[in-house]
Amino acid sequence: MSRKFDLKTITDLSVLVGTGISLYYLVSRLLNDVESGPLSGKSRESKAKQSLQWEKLVKRSPALAEVTLDAYERTILSSIVTPDEINITFQDIGGLDPLISDLHESVIYPLMMPEVYSNSPLLQAPSGVLLYGPPGCGKTMLAKALAKESGANFISIRMSSIMDKWYGESNKIVDAMFSLANKLQPCIIFIDEIDSFLRERSSTDHEVTATLKAEFMTLWDGLLNNGRVMIIGATNRINDIDDAFLRRLPKRFLVSLPGSDQRYKILSVLLKDTKLDEDEFDLQLIADNTKGFSGSDLKELCREAALDAAKEYIKQKRQLIDSGTIDVNDTSSLKIRPLKTKDFTKKLRMDATSTLSSQPLD
């Protein structure tokens, strides 16, 4: 009888101790999360990356050494790209020369020469710029090139970096984004697929989303009119953007599908470092007959054409290796051939002598 009692007591004690330990770790985890708020879960690696990015910014602008950042502003550092880190220029974007000229006047000059735009209210820089048009036409590349050419820091907004599980913290992160942009000016705040973030408001919106949009508009209106901080949005669904936000994007540029001349320029840029067959390559033929292709489509077409030549090289080299003609490490006996028109027309399922637009693609 006493033996049974002892076993029961031991079992109860074991369960009690196990429960106590579990509760201890659970409460400790919850307390740490509450204390950390939106910064919870930030690893040492993330914090080290933030510190490294800040050092780059200070090295580029020594005056920032006197600037202090709060915890929320530091979380935005990982989203910042300096002009030195951007490898895209207007020379890398083909077929958009008239648009680039307009963007110089609307974006680059206000960022580089704010004194010109502060002399008169009529010359104030636009509060925002919207790039809209079909996908794959270079809107994001244009935004990066604008930051590169103007020497502005580039903050790319991602919803994952704004939204937080703690109530009210998302608003603080948005506030930190604007305050950090003011400290790092000249600065471009870029919102890709802006329609997904600033879409038309309705009574069915969640409270958190509604307050976040209201906070964003308030901070947007609070930007100084010296043009040193500018918001650029990109979308292929302009009709989904709320009218209140469209009003704050007075400069709107359509980035449409390229015409024949534009496609020629885009292809020239894409193939400038690629060997082309002098006798069997007709760039104008390809440009004239790729109607409806976006810049992204043309890039993929060029990639597929180059891949065909690479596959031929691999096949020939394997045959020579198998026959014992060359060694596997031999790189001088065989070269990748230049690209030909047929490499492109093959991908469009056409005969090289036919016009591409007159034939079915299936």
Swiss-Prot record:
InterPro entries: AAA+_ATPase (IPR003593), AAA_lid_3 (IPR041569), ATPase_AAA_core (IPR003959), ATPase_AAA_CS (IPR003960), Mito_OM_Translocase_MSP1 (IPR051701), P-loop_NTPase (IPR027417)
A single GO molecular function term of this UniProt record: membrane protein dislocase activity
UniProt EC number: 7.4.2.-
Name of this protein: Outer mitochondrial transmembrane helix translocase
Effect on the protein upon substituting L69A: Impaired ability to extract tail-anchored proteins from membranes. Does not affect formation of a homohexamer
Pfam families: AAA (PF00004), AAA_lid_3 (PF17862)
Activity regulation field: Interaction with PEX3 inhibits the translocase activity by preventing unfolding of target proteins.
Substitution effect: I86A: Impaired ability to extract tail-anchored proteins from membranes. Does not affect formation of a homohexamer
Residue intervals on the Cytoplasmic side: 29-362
Effect of deleting the gene: Impaired transmembrane tail-anchored protein localization, characterized by mislocalization of PEX15 to the mitochondrion outer membrane.
Effect of E193Q: Loss of ATPase activity. Does not affect formation of a homohexamer
Positions contributing to ATP binding: G133, P134, P135, G136, C137, G138, K139, T140
Role played: Outer mitochondrial translocase required to remove mislocalized tail-anchored transmembrane proteins on mitochondria. Specifically recognizes and binds exposed hydrophobic surfaces of mistargeted tail-anchored transmembrane proteins. Acts as a dislocase that mediates the ATP-dependent extraction of mistargeted tail-anchored transmembrane proteins from the mitochondrion outer membrane. Able to unfold protein substrates by processive threading through its central pore.
GO-annotated biological processes: extraction of mislocalized protein from mitochondrial outer membrane; protein hexamerization; protein targeting to mitochondrion
Primary localization class, coarse: mitochondrion
Effect on the protein of changing G95A: Impaired ability to extract tail-anchored proteins from membranes. Does not affect formation of a homohexamer
Result after altering D12T: Impaired ability to extract tail-anchored proteins from membranes. Does not affect formation of a homohexamer
Mitochondrial intermembrane side: 1-12
Subcellular location: Mitochondrion outer membrane; Peroxisome membrane
Domain of life: Eukaryota
Catalytic activity: [protein]-with a C-terminal TM segment(out) + ATP + H2O = [protein]-with a C-terminal TM segment(in) + ADP + phosphate + H(+)
Keywords: ATP-binding, Membrane, Mitochondrion, Mitochondrion outer membrane, Nucleotide-binding, Peroxisome, Translocase, Transmembrane, Transmembrane helix
Source organism phylogeny: Eukaryota, Fungi, Dikarya, Ascomycota, Saccharomycotina
Segments passing through the bilayer: 13-28
